[in-house]
Amino acid sequence: RSLKSHNAKRRATAVWERGCPRGCTFCSHNGMSRIDLQNIYGDGNRKDGEKLVRISDKENDTFQLPARWPSPQYAVDNIKLLKEKYDIDFVAIVDENMTSNLKWTKEFCGLYVKEGLNESVPWGTLGDAPSVATKPEIIKIMKDAGCDYISFGFESASNKVLNEDIQKGQLRSHLQKTLDTLKQEKMTPLTTFMIGNPHENIDDLMETVDFWIQ
């Protein structure tokens, strides 16, 4: 109840991100992208299709699904319009990669403060643990720009499950670092988990339970 989003009277939702750079096994982004790659770009061959539209990461010898965003100015102008026309007092930005798209998010936050929206229209969004673990300064930047919460899909605290089933590129150490950073910035952590993953046993589940308790 301390979150401003719970007290908002005129709440809006915004989404600007198209696609996702991650390949999480359980997510509809991944499933739909694979179908599109196969049907449109790969001439029936999914791997050939992936190579055509994925961004090569030569250091890690992997591919990432591309994602697209409008300009930060466009996003801020959207929220200004919603404030002026509908008098919103909170906006939920449901883009999933605001903590990893650092350049975009920093520019967005700067413009948001410049327009005074950080005081009149607080906001919340989604993020990912690996990016916060490596670039924790993004949390303070977002908080200073009016960000009230960031929801993270932790999924599991078992490295085995994270590696074999989730395949998001995150480890338990990333989860802990993210929580530590949020606590330092006095932001309430919002996290989601899944149980019943294909390779998960009771020991893996208890790792996650122990993580919750700690």
Give, region by region, the residue ranges found by the protein language model.
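Radical SAM [4Fe-4S] cluster-binding motif and immediate context
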Residues: S2-L190, N197, D210
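Glycine-rich phosphate-binding active-site loops on the catalytic face of alpha/beta enzymes
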Residues: Q214
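Short alpha-helix in the alpha/beta-hydrolase fold that links the catalytic acid
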Residues: D204-T208
